UniProtKB/Swiss-Prot annotation:
Annotated spans, GPR motif: 253-255
Cysteines joined through disulfide linkages: 82-135, 165-249, 191-244, 196-207
Modification comment: N-glycosylated.
Further facts: Some rotavirus strains are neuraminidase-sensitive and require sialic acid to attach to the cell surface. Some rotavirus strains are integrin-dependent. Some rotavirus strains depend on ganglioside for their entry into the host cell. Hsp70 also seems to be involved in the entry of some strains. In group A rotaviruses, VP7 defines the G serotype.
Annotated signal sequence range: 1-50
Domain of life per record: Viruses
UniProt subcellular location: Virion; Host endoplasmic reticulum lumen
Protein name per UniProt: Outer capsid glycoprotein VP7
Function according to Swiss-Prot or TrEMBL: Calcium-binding protein that interacts with rotavirus cell receptors once the initial attachment by VP4 has been achieved. Rotavirus attachment and entry into the host cell probably involves multiple sequential contacts between the outer capsid proteins VP4 and VP7, and the cell receptors. Following entry into the host cell, low intracellular or intravesicular Ca(2+) concentration probably causes the calcium-stabilized VP7 trimers to dissociate from the virion. This step is probably necessary for the membrane-disrupting entry step and the release of VP4, which is locked onto the virion by VP7.
Binding positions for Ca(2+) 1 per the UniProt entry: 95, 206, 214, 216
Length: 326
């Protein structure tokens, strides 16, 4: 009898010991797996740059959602500012450390070092082809030039407003503009745009649809063209498609994270003459022409007042964002 009891106790103790060993082994294996996984995650995290992607929006929507202006009560600790200037500014200043100097001056106005970006462009024509607006707030300095007044006005109309655009196939279709907010925007290295209005029988009015030489020329070798024709009338178009892209666009409203500072000139360029443009002269301003150092000093002095007229945006934009595809 005692032998049976001892055997039972021995088997019970052996089972407990074996179970304890199995549990410890499982624990060690799980620890190894978890620690190895965490190590892999840490290593990969240092090697991979995360990227946020947007979502497709309906035709009635805008990729540019305005946020409440946070500049009223707090410094710009979480905002970025892009300052766009012509190359002649840096050429005149001729100082390799001028940007660092301005960054320190912006710091005195509440903009932390690293939050202000300086973007150089060659000229108005080149900038209009690819106006990249990356920051929460974007200030564009444009030196007035009477020979480029039309280019400056069209560029201002483009970047101060949001546009919803579709591609156009001008080889197959006729197009008409439905209302005053409907424009055709052409961009490229060289854009020549010709139009031929059509009657109800699709015959040219004062032109032959088979002969582009008889079309009305509305732009010649320009980099940016905003074409406005008579509403409700079909048009046959001829565009230098090898060097230019044309799109059918609808003006949605003001892009309030952009402001233009005209440097010099007798008057501020007025784009509000367009019936589709709501008055927005507070984001189109002028400062007297001086040396470029004086221009930048003036911008630093008044940057916070300028920002008060703008709204911070939810995302940065590049040139493709001007073309909202359906």
């Amino acid at each position: 009898m005692y032998g049976i009891e001892y055997t039972t106790i021995l088997i019970f103790l052996t089972s407990i010991t074996l179970l304890n060993y199995i549990l410890k082994s499982i624990t060690r294996i799980m620890d190894y797996i978890i620690y190895r996984f965490l190590l892999i995650v840490v290593v990969l995290a240092t090697m991979i740059n995360a990227q946020n992607y947007g979502v497709n929006l309906p035709i009635t929507g805008s990729m540019d959602t305005a946020y409440a202006n946070s500049t009223q009560s707090e410094p710009f600790l979480t905002s970025t500012l892009c300052l766009y200037y012509p190359v002649e500014a840096s050429n005149e200043i001729a100082d390799t450390e001028w940007k660092d100097t301005l960054s320190q001056l912006f710091l005195t106005k509440g903009w932390p070092t690293g939050s202000v970006y300086f973007k150089e462009y060659t000229d108005i024509a080149a900038f209009s082809v690819e106006p990249q607006l990356y920051c929460d707030y974007n200030l564009v300095l444009m030196k007035y030039d009477s020979t480029q007044e039309l280019d400056m006005s069209e560029l201002a109309d483009l970047i101060l407003n949001e546009w919803l655009c579709n591609p156009m196939d001008i080889t197959l279709y006729y197009y008409q503009q439905t209302d005053e907010a409907n424009k055709w925007i052409s961009m490229g290295s060289s854009c020549t745009v010709k139009v031929c209005p059509l009657n109800t029988q699709t015959l040219g009015i004062g032109c032959l649809i088979t002969n582009p030489d008889t079309f009305e020329t509305v732009a010649t070798t320009e980099k940016l063209v905003i074409t406005d024709v008579v509403d409700g009338v079909n048009h046959k178009l001829n565009v230098t498609t090898a060097t230019c892209t044309i799109r059918n666009c609808k003006k949605l409203g003001p892009r309030e994270n952009v402001a233009i500072i005209q440097v010099g000139g007798a008057n501020v360029l007025d784009i509000t003459a367009d019936p589709t443009t709501a008055p927005q002269t507070e984001r189109m301003m002028r400062i007297n022409w001086k040396k470029w150092w004086q221009v930048f000093y003036t911008v630093v002095d008044y940057v916070n007042q300028i920002i008060q007229t703008m709204s911070k945006r939810s995302r940065s934009l590049n040139s493709s964002a001007f073309y909202y595809r359906v």
